[in-house]
Amino acid sequence: MKSNNPFTRHGIEHLSPSKINLWVTDPALFIGTYLCGMKGSYGVGAFRGTAVEFALNKKIVDTDLSKEATNEFLYGSFNEQCIEKGLSTENIKAQKERNTLETYYDQAFNVYKDFGVPEFYQHKIYYTLHEDLPTPFLGFIDFVFNDAIRDLKTTARMPSSISTNHQRQLAVYSKAFPDKELWVDYVTPKQAVSYKVENVEQILNQVIKISLGLQKFLSISDDPYELASMHYP
């Protein structure tokens, strides 16, 4: 029996902040990736962020962890991700990122060292955001503390303000812990800056409107290539 859900008819079993943000910033790439099966590229910068978060969690949970042990988690996580993607750790880009890991980690630790032990790390959320959106949202929260949700972003250049994409991401997470503050922590090798997400309900309503708009677009046709023809890359 044919589904009445436009998302599942196109093979989209769940929504996520990254999918919604991609739909807004680059509809053609969204269509190519999620409707037409085009394989997306990946950057080793993402490996860097995951490795820093992993080692950071190990350290703030066990404050007695030595620098050597922490580095084992840091470099081990990075190398493992490279291997999983079939990327040699001798790759020039991988080496460049690997050489900066400790500087990113040190900046992140200076931010997180006084927050205590997190209640959750990489906490999975999975829920329906709106009654008119049958497809649930899936996401993973970096750190959940007693009073706040915190998302760590490693970046080569410090932004002047919190990005709209990251505000949407944290707003989606807020549904799981509505009483907690939302913070995005940007970390470069030289500094760290934290931004609190304000106007959460307004941003969440924006996410809902974007999602409903995407749902309406997908309902136009079950043929992904017909939908693709409506957007010039």
Question: Model segments located where?
Answer:
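A general structural signal for short secondary-structure junctions and capping/turn motifs
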Residues: 21, 173-176
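Short, surface-exposed beta-strand-loop junctions and turns on beta-sheet-rich folds
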Residues: 38, 156-159, 190-191
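Generic recognition of stable, solvent-exposed alpha-helical segments in well-folded globular domains
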Residues: 47, 51, 165-168, 205, ...
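Non-catalytic protein-protein interaction segments used by genome-maintenance enzymes to assemble
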Residues: 127-169, 176
